[in-house]
A protein has these predicted regions:
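The feature marks the mature, well-folded catalytic cores of soluble enzymes
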Residues: 22-223
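Sec/Tat signal peptide C-region and signal peptidase I cleavage site
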Residues: 17-21
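Positively charged n-region of N-terminal signal peptides that target proteins for export
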Residues: 1-6
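Bacterial N-terminal signal peptides
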Residues: 7-15
Length: 223
């Protein structure tokens, strides 16, 4: 990974995407209860998540830029059907759409009644904690710039184990290798909303990534 530039970013982000009961529209910010639970969650992390063997990619990779073309868009379908319906309407014209839902028939009906074709839509009956898939979903990297497509993941910065399993679920569905920064010395607590790569070796992030990885220096995170 190229050098990470630590900056403060303020902007609008399109959100498509227990140690608590499922609350699909739950808080984006970490709650006081979750703050208290985070240390124990990290200590027992691999008990909470269903993962492949946590290893880093076998060689240099290029992280996909924020604005590069995508093969698929992922949504966690919750109690925001009007907004999510219109996201799907726009997305199916450009790419495949993968929807995580506990009720595929209901979602299918909503989309069909709105005149949205389902040819490019896949429903996965998988659990999740919240709507914020931008933060916990998979990220893609390429070997040799545009060669092999792989999925990468890290430890989500919320104690929400069902959310944290989504990258592995997507990797299994797409039959793609998944590599994870979840085991020392490469373990890394992070969130997709604080992860803005340019595709050329620079990753933009706020100082939050330093706060959430107190055992690592800026140089270690850069590397």
């Amino acid at each position: 990974m190229g050098r990470i530039q630590y900056i403060f970013i303020l902007g609008l982000v399109l959100l498509v995407t227990q140690v608590r009961a499922q609350d699909p529209n739950g808080s984006h910010a970490i709650t006081p209860e979750e703050q208290q639970a985070m240390a124990a969650y990290l200590k027992n992390y691999h008990q909470y998540t269903l993962r492949a063997t946590p290893v880093v990619p076998p060689g240099p990779v290029r992280t996909m830029a924020e604005w590069e073309p995508i093969q698929a868009l992922i949504l966690s379908w919750t109690g925001q059907p009007t907004i999510q319906r219109e996201i799907v309407r726009a997305a199916v014209k450009e790419c495949k759409v993968i929807i995580l839902t506990s009720n595929a028939d209901n979602v299918s009906g909503i989309l069909t009644n709105a005149g949205i074709p389902l040819d490019s839509v896949t429903f996965l009956n998988e659990p999740f904690n919240t709507i914020w898939v931008r933060d916990y979903g998979p990220w893609t990297v390429y070997k040799n710039d545009i060669d092999s497509l792989w999925i990468v993941d890290w430890i989500y910065n919320r104690p929400r184990p069902q959310d944290d399993q989504v990258p592995g679920i997507i990797a299994n569905y797409l039959n793609l290798p998944i590599y994870e920064a979840t085991q020392a010395p490469y373990d890394w607590v992070h969130t997709g909303g604080n992860h803005l790569p340019d595709g050329l070796g620079t990753l933009f992030s706020s100082n939050l990534v330093l706060d959430e990885n107190p055992g690592k220096s800026e140089a270690q995170i850069d590397s």
